Amino acid sequence: MNHSHAAINHGPNRRKFLVTTAMAGAVLGIAPLTLMGSSHSQQTQKGETNMKTRKLGTMEVSELGAGCMSISSNYGPPADKAQGIATIRAAHAEGVTFFDTAEVYGPYTSELLVGEALEPIRNEVKIATKFGFNVEGDGAPLSTPAQIKKVAEASLKRLRTDHIDLFYQHRVDPKVPMEDVAGAVKELIQEGKVLHFGLSEAGVANIRRAHSVQRVTAIQSEYSFIERAPEHNGVLGVCAELGIGFVPWGPVGMGFLTGWMTPETRFDPKTDYRHKFPRFSPENIRANLPILDIVVKKAAEKGTTPVQISLAWLLSRRPFIVPIPGTRSLAHLSENHGARAVALTEADIRQMEAAFAPLTVHGESMDAANMALCERA
């Protein structure tokens, strides 16, 4: 995720849900997926992976990326280092070329792990990281040009690289004009330390302001079957207009769309931020079950899983969308990538949207403090 993402506890296993819905055996091996905007397949040293590519602006990446926050922070205790490295390298072996991290994840531990894991294959992958918080101070947004350049130098060292492929502003800093932010990143691009510029949870006005100074390659914001803000606030539209890619975080609704949550699910207040997020209260989980049911029914119909339907739905929305599901589990990694083989037809999408349209999403996905950092209006 971005900033203070919720931390999934390791209580219910999402595969228990698949068993109860008679879908446990139907994970991979489904009919080929054809999605507008996907290009040629990726190859690795292990051979053909069938992973297609998409364009974020002018940057070509695998159609599914890998969110690396949950491996080392925010989703319960950090994974064992060897496990984390193995998961990242397994993603690459399956064709993933786009890895997402941030200074604030840990802080620092995610970048360190990503840097070590990808160092032997650095020339085969694209790494995205983020600046924008006063990590050493009060944690508030901080995007002064001096801070941006300081973070860039530190991130380069942690990532064991001489360039950052995509450098996002993690959250808009209301105290620093967007033109100054874009100008600082432009200077880093001119120096060769950064290749592409991105924004996270920025609104249309700031996207345009940034793009007028330095081409914006990608916007990263929360987007999933249950979280539709980018469809309504103009962000997807401005991305299409300006040739900017879109990277959804929380592509399975912070775990809600996996299907394992119930109104009885409780989140550990010490390790899982969702305990304070309104959407994950018992009453709102119960109220939102009709939304989950749409995904569950389509998964049963297609002989696949709710996770794969959720990711396939995102891939079908726009040709410039590249979801970044995160996991520390090799089994879940393979399940995520199985979404590429799920064939959602136009009729499937219409059916899902018609079922969703009359429903109300209950509860914000984050608490008020986190929502205040996002330009979603």
Q: How should each PLM-predicted stretch be described?
A:
Residues N13-A31:
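N-terminal export leaders
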Residues G57-Y75, A128-G139:
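N-terminal small/glycine-rich loop or linker at the start of catalytic domains
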Residues D100-A117, R171:
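Glycine-rich, proline-tolerant flexible connector loops at the mouths of alpha/beta enzymes
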Residues M1-K16, S39:
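N-terminal secretory signal peptides
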Residues L33-G65:
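C-terminal segment of N-terminal export signals and the immediately downstream linker at the start
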